[in-house]
Curated annotation (Swiss-Prot):
Predominant cellular place of this UniProt entry's protein: nucleus
Protein's gene: WRKY32
Cellular component per GO, a single term: nucleus
Gene3D superfamilies per record: WRKY domain
Compartments it resides in: Nucleus
Protein name per UniProt: Probable WRKY transcription factor 32
Length: 466
């Protein structure tokens, strides 16, 4: 009996427990059902907002792309939810126009234009103010034809650069300079003729884009144009149209401007006579040179050679003096300033360079130790002093008489190249050869050279001519 009562109690306990669990399961399932229904409501609300937005976009696309305004009825609908109250403007559009709008949107050319349009956002209004939304004015979107008529038409032009090099005139030119010009803005290129001893030059003026605007010829060619196997017709016209620079023998230089864009054939007839006259004048001068007598031409040639030898400023007199090593820098009576030093091949001792301190005096000298005798020095003078010997300073002492006599030819304006050897021995034989050389020095250098030679002879030195 006790066992039966225990089983009954257990059954009642399980029944009570199951009754308690069933309400809990029912509450959980009900909560899940509510969540599902709420999610479905949210999805429906989202789908409705997406459809309304697509409808507005289609309305605006149809208004933009259609040439005739469609019959569109704007309906104001108020959708109220538990949390948000929204007012959405939707439009009723025919199906064929929507399909046409979809085809237009797929074209890439109109996709960029549709991106620039602004979409009017939805207005959140209260139910009391919802009636005022019907009074909002509709914004008219311009049609495609109006946009085409209002937009400016841009023509893209391709600029073809003109070649910088102008037509050849038959001569060979070498460029030697270029500079920028402000007025007119551009650049100038400078050329000279490559022919030897030809002074002809030309200037090419170019604009900003590099096109040659004009050519300025300076000087006259002293030769014929170099021969070529073939010429283009344009080169022949330009060569014929160049105006001769000098009209007569007295004119040295003249400018002639030839615009690069102009046709030179118009001025060819005017210049043919002048160029022919120039050729005749050249031939006449050549004939006169051929008919000139031989002695007269020889005399002119000698005079030109002598004038060339006198007019050469780069050549300087050169005197080489061998003296003892104890001779000072200012031992010749002049004042010197050292301006350089360098090593010479074959001599372990450096060579020192000096210039005369007198203003405007071109005389230079360099002193180096002799290779065979380290106690002797070799002094080389270049140039002639154009001033008197300065008064010696006390600190330098009196100048050496032997060195002064040896450097005496540098104090006169002569152009003879002599070499004076001053041996270290005090006794030398003076014979007929020294007397003959002294007479030659008298003829070339004058009385002062003779006096210096007599001084050297009196102290026992020998002068040798190179």
């Amino acid at each position: 009996m006790e066992e039966d009562t225990g089983i009954d109690e257990a059954k009642t306990y399980t029944v009570e427990k199951s009754e308690k669990v069933e309400p809990e399961k029912d509450g959980l399932s009900q909560f899940r059902d509510e969540e599902k229904s709420l999610g479905a409501d949210m999805e429906d609300l989202h789908d409705e907002t997406v459809r309304e937005t697509l409808g507005k976009d289609q309305v605006q696309g149809v208004r933009e792309n259609s040439s005739v305004e469609p019959n569109v009825e704007d309906v104001l609908e108020v959708n109220e939810t538990d949390s948000v109250k929204e007012t959405v403007v939707s439009a009723i559009v025919p199906v064929d126009e929507v399909e046409e709008n979809r085809q237009v949107e797929t074209s890439p050319s109109l996709a960029a234009s549709s991106d620039s349009l602004t979409v009017t956002p939805c207005l959140s209004l209260d139910p009391a103010t919802a009636s005022t939304a019907q009074d909002l004015p509709l914004v008219s979107v311009p049609t495609k034809q109006e946009q085409r008529s209002d937009s400016p038409v841009v023509n893209r032009l391709s600029v073809t650069p003109v070649p910088r090099t102008p037509a050849r005139d038959g001569y060979n030119w070498r460029k030697y300079g270029q500079k920028q010009v402000k007025s007119p803005k551009g650049s100038r290129s400078y050329y000279r003729c490559t022919y030897t001893e030809c002074c002809a030059k030309k200037i090419e003026c170019s604009n900003d884009s590099g096109n040659v605007v004009e050519i300025v010829n300076k000087g006259l060619h002293t030769h014929e144009p170099p021969r070529k196997t073939s010429f283009s017709p344009r080169e022949i016209r330009v060569t014929t149209a160049i105006r001769p620079v000098s009209e007569d023998d007295t004119v040295v230089e003249e400018l002639s401007i030839v615009p690069s864009g102009s046709d030179p054939s118009a001025s060819t007839k005017e210049y043919i006579c002048e160029s022919q006259t120039l050729v005749d004048r050249k031939r006449h001068c050549e004939n006169e040179a051929v008919e000139e007598p031989e002695p007269k031409r020889r005399l002119k040639k000698d005079n030109s050679q002598s004038s060339d030898s006198v007019s050469k400023p780069g050549k300087k007199n050169k005197f080489v003096v061998h003296a003892a090593g104890d001779v000072g820098i200012c031992g010749d009576g002049y004042r010197w300033r050292k301006y350089g030093q360098k090593m010479v091949k074959g001599n372990p001792h450096p060579r020192n360079y000096y210039r005369c301190t007198s203003a405007g005096c071109p005389v230079r000298k360099h002193i180096e130790t002799a290779v065979e005798n380290t106690k002797a020095v070799i002094i080389t003078y270049k140039g002639v002093h154009n001033h008197d010997m300065p008064v010696p300073k006390k600190r330098h002492g009196p100048p050496s008489s032997m060195l002064v006599a040896a450097a005496a030819p540098t104090s006169m304006r002569t152009r003879t190249d002599d070499q004076v050897n001053i041996p270290t021995s005090s006794q030398c034989s003076v014979g007929r050869e020294s007397e003959k050389q002294s007479k030659e020095a008298l003829d070339v250098g004058g009385e002062k050279v003779m006096e210096s030679a007599r001084t050297l002879l009196s102290i026992g030195f020998e002068i040798k001519q190179c």
